[in-house]
Amino acid sequence: MVHDYFVVYLPEQRHVSPHTIRSYRKTIEELLNYVKEQNHIPLAEVKLEHLTADCILSYLAYLRKERNCSVATQNTRAAAIRAFLSYVSDRDMTVIHIMTQIKKLPFAKPDAFQSVDYLSTDAISAIVEQTDPETEKGFRDRVLLILMYDTGARVQEILNIRLCDIQLGKVPKVTLFGKGRKKRTVPLMQKTVKYLNQYISRFHAGQSKGAEAYLFYSVIHGQTERLTDRRIRYIMEEYGQKARASCPEIPEHIHPHIFRHSRAMHLYQAGMDLTLVSQWLGHSNISTTLVYAHADTEQKRKAIEAATPPSSTLGKSLNPTRFTVTDEDLLKKLTGLR
């Protein structure tokens, strides 16, 4: 049943992305290993009866206390477990009572706003400039990084782009297919258009603009294959490490999503309305986008504190809560009144 869930049900019936399948598989594998160790039994002897509500709560507590996993990670794991057990209970009536218990488990409550990792425009430029446009690989990687930043797209959205999804005419834009096959169109900046025209001429010579070929690909043993998210992560790490020598603010390990976070933050800091930022990112709920407003406000608060000596009378009068999202000026900006 586990095999059918991951090999047939998720990819062929639910059309779940490879990234989500990997996440779900990792969760179920971790959970089964946890049950095995807690009950001191071989993996082959782990049964559905072991997956009680208490067991799941214990596993989530283990993630929180021993693995120091974030609330988001805990909830992702909980959602994966619920999805799997829902599938199982639809096919095995004897475990419905287990699913009923699991459904009652509450998700962990995150802080009102969690921190956002993002890079400055200088750091983004430093990473992009590590690519060598004189080589095929270097030029491809440069276009990839520029497009990732310009669109603020998720990794899977970038990987799914086909030639037919790109329009480089008077109103240049790209169509992205996000979570749940949700579609959105994102405008492209002229510098990005210039690079894309060169890239398509170089890597897709002879192909029509309406072709179904994936924009980014690699050639392995003479076979053309779509670029993988693992490859993109490697590319990010490679150029991130090189750029760190000239730009120390770049963290030791960077992930593709940091370009998305950075683009969103830069757009917000440049004055783009939060509703537009939300649409740009493809968020289904603007509350998800509020994290960027909070992060920017928190950054300003820290800058003010750093600029004010602790012994200063002014410093003593500063109240940090004044600069939270409840601030009237910020609220007016968030609601479009300013």
PLM segments and residue spans:
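Conserved catalytic core of the tyrosine transesterase superfamily
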Residues: 1-338
